């Protein structure tokens, strides 16, 4: 099977995270031939590919062209990382041209800017793996499942469940640390709470979340505007 990794506008962390699979990369290479991945190879091709991993937001005209090319060439497209699935931090920008002007003045942008949007706003996506960055073990298992003809299953539970399964102390109730775990999609194995930190919501909203209830709980700890800021950082709740 042929695998392509396509990067749009982002910090580069999601593509780099794939390389941090280390020895497991060798396991993947038993199933996949890397057709395109600029962090790992200078090879580029126009051939059809079986699986495309797309990271980043669509923020420029070039991004949109790369995304459409990846979709047209691939049988199975995965939006990888919260930029691709929800828009993430840069998705907060509602007017990219105005944001550019505030930083750089009235000069002409070097590229055609678009308001940052997730991959899912532009093309059909076969599977989505959120996270900033995503859990590399999750993407490894998804790729192995696809190679074996098994349809991957999205996580449909909140981070809170993973805290319970790992028997972590609840940082929200026990330590009064702001935590979005009750309303954030699981799949990270409760990484932040495992270090005694509150979940920052980087995987976006969970199914059947109760954001109004979460807001009321957090009001006992934070002012309203700070709660709203936390909820808007990675996804549009």
Curated annotation (Swiss-Prot):
Superkingdom, taxonomy of origin: Archaea
An annotated GO cellular component: cytoplasm
Keywords of the record: 3Fe-4S, 4Fe-4S, Cytoplasm, Iron, Iron-sulfur, Metal-binding, NAD, NADP, Nickel, Oxidoreductase
Listed EC numbers: 1.12.1.5
Annotated [4Fe-4S] cluster 2 binding sites: 160, 163, 170, 179
Temperature remarks: Optimum temperature is greater than 90 degrees Celsius. Activity increases with increasing temperature from 30 degrees Celsius to 90 degrees Celsius. Has a half-life of 6 hours at 95 degrees Celsius.
Catalysed reaction equations from the record: H2 + NADP(+) = NADPH + H(+); H2 + NAD(+) = NADH + H(+)
GO molecular function, one term: metal ion binding
Cofactor: Ni(2+); [4Fe-4S] cluster; [3Fe-4S] cluster
Broad class of enzyme this protein falls into: oxidoreductase
SUPFAM superfamilies registered for this protein in UniProt: HydA/Nqo6-like
Localization in the cell: Cytoplasm
Chain residues that bind [4Fe-4S] cluster 1: 11, 14, 83, 132
Residues holding [3Fe-4S] cluster: 188, 192, 199, 202
Details of cofactor binding: Binds 1 nickel ion per subunit. Binds 2 [4Fe-4S] clusters.
Main localization of the protein described in the UniProt heading: cytoplasm
pH dependence: Optimum pH is 8 for hydrogenase activity at >95 degrees Celsius.
PANTHER family linked: COENZYME F420-REDUCING HYDROGENASE, GAMMA SUBUNIT, CYTOSOLIC NIFE-HYDROGENASE, DELTA SUBUNIT
Function: Part of a bifunctional enzyme complex that functions as a hydrogen-evolving hydrogenase with sulfur-reducing activity. May play a role in hydrogen cycling during fermentative growth. Activity exhibited with NAD in addition to NADPH. The alpha and delta subunits form the hydrogenase component that catalyzes the reduction of protons to evolve hydrogen.
Family of this protein: Belongs to the [NiFe]/[NiFeSe] hydrogenase small subunit family.
Subunit field text: Dimer of heterotetramer of alpha, beta, gamma and delta subunits. The nickel-containing alpha and delta subunits constitute the hydrogenase activity. The beta and gamma subunits (flavin-containing dimer) constitute the sulfur reductase activity.
Protein name (database record): Sulfhydrogenase 2 subunit delta
Species name: Pyrococcus furiosus (strain ATCC 43587 / DSM 3638 / JCM 8422 / Vc1)
Primary gene name: shyD
């Amino acid at each position: 099977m042929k695998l392509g990794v396509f990067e749009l506008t982002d910090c580069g962390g999601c593509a780099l995270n794939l390389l941090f699979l280390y020895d497991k990369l060798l396991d993947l290479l038993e199933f996949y031939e890397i057709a395109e991945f600029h962090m790992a190879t200078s090879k580029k091709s126009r051939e059809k590919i079986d699986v495309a991993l797309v990271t980043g937001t669509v923020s420029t005209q070039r991004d949109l062209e790369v995304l459409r090319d990846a979709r047209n060439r691939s049988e199975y497209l995965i939006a990888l990382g919260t930029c691709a699935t929800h828009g993430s931090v840069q998705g907060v920008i509602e007017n990219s041209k105005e944001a550019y002007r505030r930083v750089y003045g009235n000069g002409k942008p070097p590229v055609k800017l678009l308001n940052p949007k997730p991959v899912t706003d532009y093309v059909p996506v076969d599977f989505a793996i959120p996270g900033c960055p995503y859990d590399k073990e999750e993407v490894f298992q998804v790729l192995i499942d696809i190679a074996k003809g098994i349809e991957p299953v999205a996580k449909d539970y909140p981070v809170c469940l993973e805290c319970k399964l790992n028997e972590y102390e609840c940082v929200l109730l026990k330590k009064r640390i702001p935590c979005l775990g009750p309303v954030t999609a699981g799949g990270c194995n409760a990484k932040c709470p495992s270090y005694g930190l509150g979940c920052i919501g980087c995987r976006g909203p969970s199914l059947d979340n109760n954001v109004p209830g979460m807001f009321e709980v957090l009001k006992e700890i934070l002012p309203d505007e700070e709660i709203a800021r936390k909820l808007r950082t990675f996804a549009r709740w």
